[in-house]
Amino acid sequence: ALDLFSDLKILNFKSVKEDFRIIGEQVYTTDLIKNYVIGFQNRDTVIKEYSETPLFKVTTGTGFAPNNKNEGIRKNNFYGTYLLGPLLIRNPYLLEYFTKNLLKSKNVKYKAMLHDTAYQAYDAYLKNFVNKD
């Protein structure tokens, strides 16, 4: 998806096709929420040049390119990332952040919903793959 925006020149970055693939689970942090953001990447492009605000900082995995600790682009209400879905299902805290902000922009009060299974799956992933102690 980020490649499309690179070609359209809507945002200021350049995506380049490479001869290698970046495949695997990723763990990031963001200033949007205090919790980790988890996801999966499978791509053969890297971002070589960018001046947009990064969405994430790499904790484990790959950023825009190997040895780059930034990933994703954030500009106004646009959020772009190489992470594959189901991004919001795997990250209930991030889903809650976006839901609250969307409702707030429409002057609708947020009412927390019970989605214990999503939080349990998120916590289990972190326990098994990130905090292996």
Regions found by a protein language model. Give the residues of each.
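Short, acidic Gly/Pro/Ser/Thr-rich loop/turn segments
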Residues: E18, V46-E49, P86-R90
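Cysteine-nucleophile active-site neighborhood
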Residues: A1-L32
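Acyltransferase
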Residues: N77-D133
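Conserved beta-strand scaffold positions in the cores of enzyme catalytic domains, especially
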Residues: I10, G39, F78-G80
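Catalytic beta-strand/loop cores that center a nucleophilic Ser/Cys/Thr
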Residues: V27-N76
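Hydrophobic, well-ordered secondary-structure segments
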Residues: F5-L8, E25, G39, N70, ...
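Fold-independent oxyanion-binding glycine-rich loops
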Residues: F13, N42-T45, L83
